[in-house]
């Protein structure tokens, strides 16, 4: 009897190219021959072409997204109108024993930048190929670091991926010492370099940047001067804007206007629409209405906004404000529906991870994603398209 592992290469390729992305880990562990074939450039192109075609066929109803839940990273299939959220599988692990806890993820071009739970390690990961690159710090990493993953597109077939790491904070160590560090890691040269930046803006450490077309955008606010020791003031209102880091020019762009004005305790979070447009969610702490806008034009130096994409009064639906530190979301532009990930805020202990699906005319659904044993672990979501890029 002929074993499947003994099939001719062309027939083996045809069979394996039909296997879902989340099953590739099992393929690689089946035998050495399949492991070698799965990493072949011609095979990966064929496999990804088939995966994208299948995903496109399903996109009338479903999306594939990455979610980070309980310090683990999973691939989900999401139907916002049915509604249903199905865990397709855990993405290829960062290590065989799967003992790596992840606290933050950043997605760009099929790659994930992952920050470990203990803040001590940084890794770039291609979930499709299973490749990883552990990044050693120039000096050290810090709990208040902000990160971004982006790329410089040298031509249509060549992208130079880079990581931006920065912090600009005062440590409460009696000396009120300012730590200001801006540096870029180049994956091609495997090296860090310092970038000279004197910001007149602040990005809170819990605000994740959003990668779009190789650049990263943040919600930012006016920088406040340090206060004399012992003096405390309450500030609820300050200038707010969108800020972009251009990975080609390796510099921050000008302040870009938002379609609203927010206060300190309001919820503001960013998302992307098919890696072409930027979406922003805004919910004031003083009101119950959630509003979402989608950009008409978005570049490092310019942005224009469409009219409100979605406005939903949450008072009768949930009665609470989405978390300013943790809520993340994505939208189905055609169906005019959005999904917001947060905790079960009907419970005092926030013991469940919940997807809140909202739409026009009061459309509202809740999907329970399972137990949340660590209330401080935010559930993150981002759209995902597999990539064969080598790291």
Curated annotation (Swiss-Prot):
Residues 1-47 form the F-box domain. It is found in: Nucleus. PROSITE patterns: FBOX. It comes from the Eukaryota. SMART domains: FBOX. The keyword Magnesium does not apply. Pfam families: F-box (PF00646), FBA_1 (PF07734). The keyword Cell inner membrane does not apply. PANTHER family: BNACNNG10540D PROTEIN (PTHR31672), F-BOX PROTEIN CPR30-LIKE (PTHR31672:SF13). Part of a SCF (ASK-cullin-F-box) protein ligase complex. Interacts with ASK11. The F-box is necessary for the interaction with ASK proteins. This is F-box/kelch-repeat protein At3g16740. It comes from Arabidopsis thaliana.
């Amino acid at each position: 009897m002929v074993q499947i592992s003994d099939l001719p290469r062309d027939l083996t390729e045809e069979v394996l190219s039909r296997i879902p992305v989340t099953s590739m880990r099992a393929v690689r562990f089946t035998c050495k021959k399949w492991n070698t074939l799965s990493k072949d450039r011609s095979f990966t192109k064929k496999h990804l072409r088939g995966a994208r075609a299948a995903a496109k066929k399903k996109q009338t109803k479903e999306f594939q997204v990455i979610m980070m839940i309980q310090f683990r990273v999973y691939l989900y299939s999401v139907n916002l109108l049915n509604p249903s959220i199905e865990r397709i599988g855990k993405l290829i692990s960062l290590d065989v024993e799967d003992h790596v806890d992840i606290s933050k993820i950043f997605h760009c071009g099929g790659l994930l930048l992952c920050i470990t739970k203990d803040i001590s390690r940084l890794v770039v990961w291609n979930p499709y190929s299973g490749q990883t690159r552990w990044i050693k710090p120039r000096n050290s990493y810090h709990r208040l670091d902000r990160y971004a993953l982006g790329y410089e597109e040298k031509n249509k077939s060549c992208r130079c991926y880079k990581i931006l790491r920065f912090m600009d904070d005062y440590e409460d160590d009696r000396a009120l010492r300012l730590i200001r560090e801006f540096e870029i890691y180049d994956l091609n040269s495997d090296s860090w370099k310092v970038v000279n930046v004197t910001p007149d803006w602040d990005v809170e450490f819990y605000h994740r940047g959003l990668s779009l077309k190789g650049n990263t955008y943040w919600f930012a606010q006016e920088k406040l001067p340090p206060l004399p020791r012992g003096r405390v003031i309450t500030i609820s209102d300050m200038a707010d804007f969108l800020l972009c880091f251009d990975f080609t020019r390796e510099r921050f762009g000008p302040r870009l206007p938002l379609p609203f004005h927010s206060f300190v305790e309001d919820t503001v979070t960013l998302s992307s629409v098919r890696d072409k447009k930027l979406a922003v969610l805004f919910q004031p702490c003083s009101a119950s209405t959630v509003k979402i806008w989608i950009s008409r034009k978005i570049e490092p130096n310019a942005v224009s906004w469409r009219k409100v994409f979605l406005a939903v009064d949450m008072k009768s639906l949930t009665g609470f404000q989405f978390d300013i530190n943790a809520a993340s979301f994505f939208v189905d532009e055609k169906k005019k529906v959005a999904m917001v990930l947060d905790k079960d805020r009907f419970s005092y202990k926030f013991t469940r991870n919940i997807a809140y699906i909202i739409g026009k005319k009061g459309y509202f659904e809740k999907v329970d994603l399972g137990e949340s044993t660590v209330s401080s672990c935010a559930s993150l979501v981002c759209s995902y398209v597999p990539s064969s890029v080598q790291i």
